């Protein structure tokens, strides 16, 4: 019996160690929204080249009685996803610890010590349940903008509250699983208000209680228009990384835990071709930054079939599960993005963005270029992706 236990522990350790290396090319999922089984989510993610999934672990849905996780279809679905992500996709899922629970947090978020303690207990029980299965945790989601909370009870912008929540939750998870990689913030580098808030969090010492910063790089209402472009968005990520290094005196890993483009009929700038080139550019530029350890795109499948509803149309697959051009693109390039033997870099030379993929051993390289903020065609992308096979030929 002991030998079997040790074997399980060794296998779990090896899987987690393997899962923690290499670039994450992940995708967000919404179990329960699309009529899919847990197996289907992992199947579609695998089919289209993703090596991780990101999903909420809603506190309100897993604990209806104090201290007891519900025996429910929701929890069984999550159990399957978190238990099988590494074996199915190659890397651990990212588990988002969110949001409030009416038993403990009447306003939908923790605002005092007793409510923070209840959230910490939920996080600790979650870490115990998935130790050896889940490596990545995100503490809350988009606190500053109040996602998941009613508009009348938007969480306070007081940095002390979120910092204290992070501090206590970080310590509790690490006590259970020292190997866990814990992300915080959901910071939008394009948003001046988010950067201001992050600086206030840093003043409170929050960087001592995280392993990485999670970032969401959507276009923000208070951002300049250039940040709508991949070039502009990644430039803002560069500025964020520089600021973090200056404030902390050390390197801090960044994980893009949400990024996406909604393909709606009423927006002439969100055609399938436009989104394809934006996804491709963003992928190339993000992979060229060594401090960006991964990206979870938002999201796997459209959340509805109303082509005029922005929130329905972020999927890489349509609501009927047929693939968009972006899904086919990820499918074609994912193996190169995840290959540790291939290094991507980018630079601007003679008013052109030049991305270089290079085999670290053979030094064989392939370049792709475009005019900053200019268009690239599907055929140009296909040609470049096809050329990358020469980097892995032996």
Report the location of each language-model feature.
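N-terminal signal peptide c-region/cleavage motif recognized by signal peptidases
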Residues: 16-19
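Substrate-binding cleft and catalytic face of glycoside hydrolase catalytic domains
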Residues: 45-69, 74-196, 202, 206-208, ...
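Extracellular serine-dependent O-acyl
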Residues: 135-140, 182, 252-257, 288-306
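Conserved, mostly hydrophobic/aromatic
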Residues: 53, 126, 137, 169, ...
């Amino acid at each position: 019996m002991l030998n079997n236990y040790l074997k399980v522990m060794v296998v779990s350790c090896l899987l987690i160690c393997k899962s923690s290396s290499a670039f994450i090319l992940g995708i967000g999922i919404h179990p329960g929204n699309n009529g899919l089984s847990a197996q289907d989510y992992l199947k579609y993610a695998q089919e289209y080249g993703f090596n991780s999934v990101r999903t909420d672990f809603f506190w309100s849905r897993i604990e209806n009685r104090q201290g007891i996780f519900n025996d429910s279809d929701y929890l069984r679905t999550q159990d399957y996803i978190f238990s099988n992500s590494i074996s199915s996709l190659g890397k651990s899922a990212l588990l988002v610890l969110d949001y409030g629970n009416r038993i403990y947090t009447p306003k939908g978020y923790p605002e005092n010590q007793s409510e923070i303690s209840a959230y910490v207990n939920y996080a600790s029980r979650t870490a115990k349940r998935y130790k050896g299965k889940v490596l990545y945790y995100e503490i809350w989601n988009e606190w500053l903008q109040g996602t998941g909370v009613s508009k009348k009870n938007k969480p306070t912008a007081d940095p002390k509250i979120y910092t204290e929540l992070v501090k206590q939750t970080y310590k509790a998870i690490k006590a259970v699983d020292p190997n866990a990689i814990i992300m915080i913030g959901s910071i939008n580098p394009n948003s001046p208000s988010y950067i201001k808030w992050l600086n206030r969090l840093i003043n409170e010492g929050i960087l001592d209680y995280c392993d990485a910063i999670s970032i969401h790089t959507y276009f923000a209402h208070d951002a300049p228009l250039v940040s709508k472009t991949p070039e502009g968005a990644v430039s803002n990520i560069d500025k964020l990384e520089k600021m973090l290094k200056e404030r902390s005196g050390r390197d801090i890993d960044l994980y893009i835990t949400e990024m996406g483009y909604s393909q709606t009929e009423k927006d002439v700038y969100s055609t399938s071709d436009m989104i394809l080139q934006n996804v491709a550019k963003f992928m190339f530029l993000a992979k060229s930054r060594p401090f960006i350890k991964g990206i979870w795109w938002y999201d796997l499948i459209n959340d509805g079939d109303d082509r005029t509803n922005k929130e329905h149309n972020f999927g890489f697959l349509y609501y009927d599960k047929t693939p968009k051009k972006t899904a086919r693109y990820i499918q074609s390039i994912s193996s190169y993005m995840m290959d540790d033997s291939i290094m991507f870099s980018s630079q601007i030379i003679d008013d052109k963005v030049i991305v270089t993929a290079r085999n670290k051993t053979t030094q064989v390289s392939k370049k792709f270029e475009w005019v900053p903020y200019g268009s690239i065609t599907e055929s140009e992308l296909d040609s470049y992706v096809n050329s990358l096979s020469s980097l892995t030929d032996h």
